[in-house]
Curated annotation (Swiss-Prot):
One GO CC term on file: cytoplasm
UniProt-recorded name of the protein: NAD kinase
Source organism of the structure: Pseudomonas putida (strain ATCC 47054 / DSM 6125 / CFBP 8728 / NCIMB 11950 / KT2440)
Source species, domain of life: Bacteria
One GO MF term attached to the UniProt entry: ATP binding
Lineage: Bacteria, Pseudomonadati, Pseudomonadota, Gammaproteobacteria, Pseudomonadales
Residues the record lists as binding NAD(+): 72-73, 146-147, 157, 174, 176, 187-192, 247
InterPro entries xrefs: ATP-NAD_kinase_N, ATP-NAD_kinase_PpnK-typ_C, NAD/diacylglycerol_kinase_sf, NADK
Catalytic activity as recorded in UniProt: NAD(+) + ATP = ADP + NADP(+) + H(+)
Statement: the UniProt record of this protein carries the keyword DNA-binding: no
Family, similarity comment: Belongs to the NAD kinase family.
Cofactors demanded by this protein: a divalent metal cation
């Protein structure tokens, strides 16, 4: 397993719990004589840290492991910035759900030590890249680890659009919007809209209509290498938005085309050896535990 010597730290701003955890993590890493680099925005609120700092974009060039302290939203933002560097990312949960940031603060030293000693799992999670085009010209681009969502923005009106997959017409729909999600994102917004849960190792994309104006509007799972094209109706009287992971937003006009496809670079997500995807689902989604009579 790869040995890590240069460790970057990214954290969610505005939380004293995050800062406390970062201080613990920093001390632990320095005690192991590792080179620690702080993201510059976090460094500004940690006076006297005495460490090298870097912007998030450049962090991937100077580190061989990045640890994210925060919630899943923090890791989503880090993933979009770091995927192009092919650098491993480890998450310490200081948020709510913790689907991606799966190390609890109370087990920080133990689990991080295991990873640094080479005892870890690596998952390659693919991202989506989205582009909004108007009159054959790109007006907005963004990446997403979870999902790309077409929605009406501040309007309460429905959106009319057409869906094409690999150049083939699939259907036209009238709905509150459309969610295009990765397996990683299948347990996020897409799940709330009635989409299926997809195992992270699947090479697939799920397309989930949001409150479609027809009983036949159902989620569809397609090959992960598919290229999706969503054409907004020219007769639409609102300007819908496209959101990537709920963090990057672009405004569309009637007649615009949104293309969504797999991004070439993947996120290398690190887990402790005892990571169990089904246990995560059971814990975070409230699935039932084993029956008391089960012997297995």
């Amino acid at each position: 397993m790869e040995q890590f010597r240069n460790i970057g730290i990214i954290g969610r701003l505005g939380s004293s719990q995050v800062l406390d955890t970062i201080r613990r993590l920093k001390k632990f890493l320095l005690d192991r004589h590792l080179h620690v680099i702080l993201e510059d925005t976090i460094a500004e609120v940690l006076p006297g840290h005495g460490l090298q700092t870097s912007t998030r974009k450049l962090l991937g060039e100077v580190c061989d492991l990045v640890i994210v302290v925060g919630g899943d939203g923090s890791l989503l933002g880090a993933a979009r910035a770091l995927a192009r560097h092919n650098i491993p990312v480890l998450g310490i949960n200081r948020g709510n759900l913790g689907f991606l940031t799966d190390i609890r603060p109370d087990e920080l030293e133990q689990k991080v030590a295991e990873v640094l000693d080479g005892h870890y799992l690596v998952e390659n999670r693919f991202l989506l890249q989205a582009e909004v085009r108007r009159h054959h010209e790109a007006i907005g681009q963004g990446d997403a680890l979870n999902d790309v969502v077409l929605h009406p923005g501040k309007s309460t009106r429905m959106i009319e659009f057409e869906i094409y997959i690999d150049g083939q017409f699939v259907c036209s729909q009238k709905a509150d919007g459309l969610i295009v999600a990765t397996p990683t994102g299948s347990t996020a917004y897409a799940l709330s809209a009635g989409g299926p849960i997809m195992h992270p190792k699947l090479d697939a994309i799920v397309i989930v209509p949001m409150y479609p104006h027809t009983l036949s509007g159902r989620p569809i799972v397609v090959d992960g290498n598919s290229e999706l094209k969503i054409v907004v109706s020219k007769d639409l009287q609102i300007y819908p938005q496209v959101s990537c992971d709920g963090q990057n937003h672009f405004t569309c006009a009637p007649g615009d085309t949104i293309t969504v496809s797999k991004k070439p670079q993947k996120l290398r997500l690190i887990h402790p050896l005892d990571h169990n995807y089904y246990e995560v689902c059971r814990t975070k989604l409230g699935w039932g535990s084993r029956l008391g009579s089960s012997d297995d």
